[in-house]
Amino acid sequence: MPKMKTNKGAAKRFKKTAGGIKYKHATKRHILTKRTTKNKRQLRPNSILPKCEVAGVMRMLPYA
């Protein structure tokens, strides 16, 4: 059976760790002037993916 392909977009966005799957928040690249300081601060830390979405991400990352 051939090797399974890794979804390269997902590989760049998610990282498997012992605590779960880590990801960075969206909407933090540019045009941040309209966002409040509180909102930008809350988007700062990386987060762990919710359990309901783990199966879909793991399907895209077969070797993670």
Curated annotation (Swiss-Prot):
Q: Which PROSITE patterns match?
A: RIBOSOMAL_L35
Q: Which UniProt keywords apply?
A: Ribonucleoprotein, Ribosomal protein
**Which cellular components does GO assign to this protein?**
cytosolic large ribosomal subunit
Name the Gene Ontology biological process terms. Answer: translation
The transmembrane residues are none
One of the entry's Gene Ontology molecular-function terms is: structural constituent of ribosome
Superkingdom is Bacteria
Q: Does the keyword Transcription apply?
A: no
Family according to the record: Belongs to the bacterial ribosomal protein bL35 family.
**Under which name does UniProt file this protein?**
Large ribosomal subunit protein bL35
Q: Which organism is it from?
A: Vibrio metschnikovii
Q: Which gene encodes it?
A: rpmI
